[in-house]
């Protein structure tokens, strides 16, 4: 790599969705390629096809390369990976589009693991069309969990709200069985750790949502709050995690109580994402607690508007900004903790790090 700017790997996503449209619109602004070195994994042919369908994107000019090591400063670099010919059927879920998305993802993750890129930003995929004998994952998060180190947590981020999820892509009927006191305590510990290292929050305050309506109404609507969630919050607090709750989700968001906390832990997918997307439509999906940084825009393939020049690129921009910020915060955190200053315990009235001064014994003249 020819410069020291952060190398942002970006995957093309589903080629029949809005992935390429938001990528092209993002990098039509030349300032984006000045703040980082973008390395896009996908098909240059598909990129050209979508560019020709869009207006006001003359600034998008790409540099074709064979490997990330060839990426040039100030250029929008594209690595041609995946099938040489990808049939484009705008707005449709096809196996070909799914295969192209997976090929780009695998190539980018390989480079991420080998240090060829610094962070990863993924355009949306269709989880169903991405399935194959070689790819049996229900989403990016599950695939990254298998490829990278750490226990990932799906986390939605914006300037006003951060939401971590206890459970991700499982049926609602299985959520109650998937949570336990121990798992919630561990999730709170991981959430605290990522808020400290990745968001530079010294002592984050975390709100924990209830599972049942009205936080169970004292056990009338479910006992998970009494038997699992509240004990977990108490134990986490004893372990120096500033956790509070459980709070009934509807009132918590409707009242604006979320503004008092640095993050929220939701028990299941829609409990966290529905209010988040309402409050922060241009938010970012961050895979927390992994060894590498990965973000994505907070939207799906959007087949209904694909190819119509209607997609808003702001969430993609925010995903790139977030990846860069998190990478920098994590690097500073590592530097601060690499050689901490030696700490001495003080007893009241004296410094035990200093030897007591002994006066010479008095002698008679």
Name these PLM-found stretches.
Residues 1-139, 182-267, 271-285, 289-301, ...:
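Contiguous, glycine/small-aliphatic-enriched amphipathic segments in soluble metabolic enzymes
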Residues 131-154:
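Glycine/threonine-rich beta-strand-loop-alpha-helix active-site module
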Residues 143, 154, 163-165, 294:
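Conserved hydrophobic/aromatic beta-strand scaffold that supports enzyme active sites
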Residues 156-186:
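Ligand-binding beta-strand-loop-alpha-helix segment within the catalytic cores
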Residues 152-155, 196-198:
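A generic local secondary-structure boundary/capping motif
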């Amino acid at each position: 790599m020819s410069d020291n700017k952060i190398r942002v790997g970006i995957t093309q996503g589903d080629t029949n969705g809005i992935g390429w449209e938001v990528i092209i619109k993002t990098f039509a602004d030349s300032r984006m390629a000045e703040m980082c070195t973008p390395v896009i994994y996908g098909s240059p042919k598909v990129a050209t096809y979508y560019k020709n369908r869009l207006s006001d994107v003359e600034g998008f000019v790409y540099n074709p390369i064979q490997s990330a090591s060839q990426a040039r400063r100030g250029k929008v670099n594209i690595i041609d990976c995946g099938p040489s010919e990808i049939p484009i059927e705008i707005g449709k879920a096809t196996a070909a589009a799914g295969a192209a998305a997976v090929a780009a993802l695998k190539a980018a993750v390989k480079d991420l693991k080998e240090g060829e890129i610094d962070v990863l930003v993924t355009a949306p995929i269709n989880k169903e069309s991405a399935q194959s004998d070689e790819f049996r994952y229900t989403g990016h998060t599950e695939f990254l969990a298998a490829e990278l180190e750490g226990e990932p947590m799906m986390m939605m981020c914006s300037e006003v709200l951060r939401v971590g999820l206890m459970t991700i892509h499982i049926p609602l009927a299985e959520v109650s069985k998937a949570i336990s006191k121990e798992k919630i305590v561990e999730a709170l510990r991981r959430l605290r750790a990522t808020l400290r290292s990745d968001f530079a929050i010294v002592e984050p305050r975390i709100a924990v949502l209830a599972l049942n309506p009205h936080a169970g109404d004292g056990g009338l609507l479910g006992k998970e709050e009494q038997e699992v969630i509240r004990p977990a919050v108490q134990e986490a607090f004893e372990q120096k995690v500033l956790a509070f709750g459980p709070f009934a989700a509807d009132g918590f968001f409707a009242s604006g109580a979320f503004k008092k906390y640095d993050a929220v832990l939701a028990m299941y997918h829609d409990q966290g994402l529905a209010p988040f997307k309402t409050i922060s439509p241009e938010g970012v999906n961050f895979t927390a607690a992994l060894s590498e940084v990965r973000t994505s825009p907070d939207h799906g393939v959007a087949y209904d508007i694909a190819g119509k020049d209607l997609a808003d690129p702001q969430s993609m921009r925010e995903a790139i900004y977030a990846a860069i910020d998190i990478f920098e915060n994590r690097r500073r955190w590592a530097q601060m903790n690499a050689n901490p200053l030696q700490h001495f315990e003080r007893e009241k009235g004296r410094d035990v790090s200093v030897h007591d001064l002994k006066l010479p014994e008095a002698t008679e003249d």
